[in-house]
């Protein structure tokens, strides 16, 4: 029984392609800028107050790894892509329930558990497309401007981001089985993911409050540590993966018990 | 040629069906509903609904819009949970999700609101359903109902959406079809085609559960009817009995005003007379009515089906108590 998976995968293709193109364009933009501004980065680092860098987890801007971590991964990947996954997750169930597509889907010999799991499984499309496409673009672009990029660190920054993105989708999914209106589910999911990201960044500014950010998924994915220091936090990724599975399980339990 | 009259209900002929499937004798319950109740806060959408639908019958579930027909259907499909009572569909209890999911390969469902994936073409949508439950009768159905398969569903008219819905509901050759307002949006020709198709399915031993707010439609194809109003089943009977009690809406235009006492008979109720035109509900035999009318100088006559509301009014009163005889 993979009909739902096939259909859902197909529905994810367009968004994934668009995002891949956006990331390719962004990469091209930043890499073409880098040789011109590399020398000025020291001055740049001095010009801004330190908390700005702490907020985004930025360092070593004069290296290609630090620059890419700051420009591409700290914002576009950790925040905007996370919001995209939350948005998609929030649409998975609520949209079908609202438009009565779920009535027809569930008139088939397919269980509600299976519908949720197949819809979640269809996230493989953006996960694979972006985590294969974007590192290739970044790697090639680095070579093109005469820089070399550590391929292992690059692979890790993507691999370890997958549990993070899935948790964001999971937050959306829980809202999706809980809320009847897809716009409310999506809006709540993206605001929530943004707030969690913000809480993580802001709480890092003061060691006394840093623990608050432990609840935020982005606390467990540090793109700068991976790219600049080659620190691969597999344990943190494991925590994210476990959180994702819990969110999916909660969604399944809610969805199988509710009226649609 | 046998005489073709309005009252010639094809349902009456099916007692002596010569169809090949002898196992499909009516009687064993395909749907069994027992005290089914669904409340939303203070609103009771279904209130202790109880009846059975036997194998090989077309059961009409009749009621005005908002009466609770769709609620019953969605309870039968397990989309919503009963507050009290239960039902079985092909032997599976609607509260037992696993059992209900299993029997769905033998159930066809045509919802009132057809939620297709609008970006897909009709063909892709049918392929999608076929992967889950088969499509051995797809081509045959597409000869009767012809939605534009290569166009995206978002461009479909409501009639085309309905036809695509009909094809998906029957293409896996289900034992039971649950149809929620199946002909809404179809043009009259397609409605006739649908009715003929449903009769053929019934004759082949399939069970059809069919909701409608149009009495004439139910009257034409159904063997038995359950009437629901305000969430309660108010009548459950053979269609012939219902029609007998329902009478006919008659409008007679006379050349000149006649003395009402001479014109009105005891079978006429709710008589309204304006100048030369008399409207009434006739509860007697059609032949007697015609014999009576020829005695007057009649310019025009219309004899039609009574409105569902009139049936309620005349025969069930305005009380909300279920009638004796409800299962």
Model-found features: residue ranges?
Chain B
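ABC transporter nucleotide-binding domains
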Residues: 28-229, 235
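Short, charged/small-residue-rich alpha-helical element at the C-terminal edge
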Residues: 248-319
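Short acidic active-site motifs
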Residues: 99, 238, 288-289
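ABC-family P-loop ATPase nucleotide-binding domain
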Residues: 1-37, 318-327
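Short, surface-exposed acidic/glycine-rich loop or hinge patches that mediate macromolecular interfaces
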Residues: 94-97, 147, 233, 257, ...
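ABC transporter nucleotide-binding domain
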Residues: 195-280
């Amino acid at each position: 029984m993979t009909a739902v998976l096939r259909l859902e995968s197909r529905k994810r293709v367009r968004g994934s392609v668009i995002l891949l193109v956006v990331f390719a364009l962004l990469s091209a933009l930043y890499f073409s800028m880098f040789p011109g501004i590399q020398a000025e980065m020291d001055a740049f680092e001095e010009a801004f107050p330190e908390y700005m860098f702490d907020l985004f987890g930025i360092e070593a801007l004069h290296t290609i790894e630090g620059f890419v971590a700051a420009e591409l991964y700290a914002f576009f990947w950790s925040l905007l892509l996370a919001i995209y996954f939350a948005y998609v997750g929030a649409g998975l169930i609520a949209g079908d329930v609202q438009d009565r597509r779920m009535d027809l889907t569930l008139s088939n010999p397919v269980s509600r558990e299976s519908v949720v799991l197949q819809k979640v499984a269809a996230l493989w499309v953006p996960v694979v497309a972006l985590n294969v496409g974007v590192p290739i673009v970044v790697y090639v672009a680095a070579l093109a401007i005469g820089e070399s990029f550590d391929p292992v660190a690059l692979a890790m920054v993507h691999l370890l981001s997958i549990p993070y993105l899935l948790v964001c989708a999971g937050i959306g999914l829980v809202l999706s089985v809980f809320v009847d209106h897809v716009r409310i589910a999506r809006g709540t999911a993206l605001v929530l993911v943004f707030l969690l990201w913000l809480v993580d960044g802001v709480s890092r500014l003061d060691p006394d409050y840093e623990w608050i950010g432990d609840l935020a998924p982005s606390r467990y994915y540090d793109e700068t540590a991976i790219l600049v220091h080659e620190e691969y936090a597999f344990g943190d990724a494991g925590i994210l993966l476990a959180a994702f599975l819990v969110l999916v399980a909660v969604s399944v339990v809610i969805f199988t018990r509710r009226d649609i | 040629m046998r005489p073709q009259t309005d009252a010639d209900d094809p349902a009456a002929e099916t007692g002596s069906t010569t169809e090949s499937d002898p196992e499909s004798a009516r009687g064993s319950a395909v749907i069994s509903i027992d005290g089914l109740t669904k409340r939303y806060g203070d609103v009771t959408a279904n209130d202790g609904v109880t009846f059975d639908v036997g194998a090989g019958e077309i059961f009409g579930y009749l009621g005005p819009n908002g009466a609770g027909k769709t609620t019953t259907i969605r309870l039968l499909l397990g989309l919503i949970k009963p507050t009290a009572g239960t039902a079985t569909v092909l032997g599976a209890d609607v509260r037992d999700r696993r059992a209900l999911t299993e029997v769905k390969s033998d159930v066809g469902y045509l919802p009132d609101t057809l939620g297709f994936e609008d970006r897909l073409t009709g063909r892709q949508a049918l392929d999608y359903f076929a992967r889950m439950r088969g499509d051995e009768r797809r081509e045959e159905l597409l000869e009767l109902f012809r939605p534009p398969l290569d166009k995206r569903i978002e461009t479909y008219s409501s009639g085309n959406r309905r036809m695509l819905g009909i094809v998906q509901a029957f293409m896996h050759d289900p034992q039971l079809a649950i149809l929620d307002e199946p002909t809404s949006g179809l043009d009259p020709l397609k409605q006739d085609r649908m009715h003929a198709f449903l009769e053929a399915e019934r004759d082949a031993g399939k069970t059809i559960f069919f909701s409608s707010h149009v009495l004439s439609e139910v009257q034409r194809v159904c063997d038995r009817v359950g009437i629901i109003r305000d969430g309660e089943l108010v009548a459950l009977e053979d269609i012939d009995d219902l029609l007998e009690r329902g009478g006919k809406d008659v409008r007679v235009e006379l050349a000149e005003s006649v003395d009402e006492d001479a014109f009105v008979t005891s079978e006429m109720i709710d008589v309204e007379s304006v100048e030369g035109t008399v409207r009434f509900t006739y509860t007697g035999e059609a032949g007697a009515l015609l014999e009576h009318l020829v005695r007057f100088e009649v310019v025009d006559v219309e004899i039609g089906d009574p409105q569902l509301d009139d049936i309620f009014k005349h025969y069930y009163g305005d009380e909300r108590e279920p009638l004796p005889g409800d299962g």
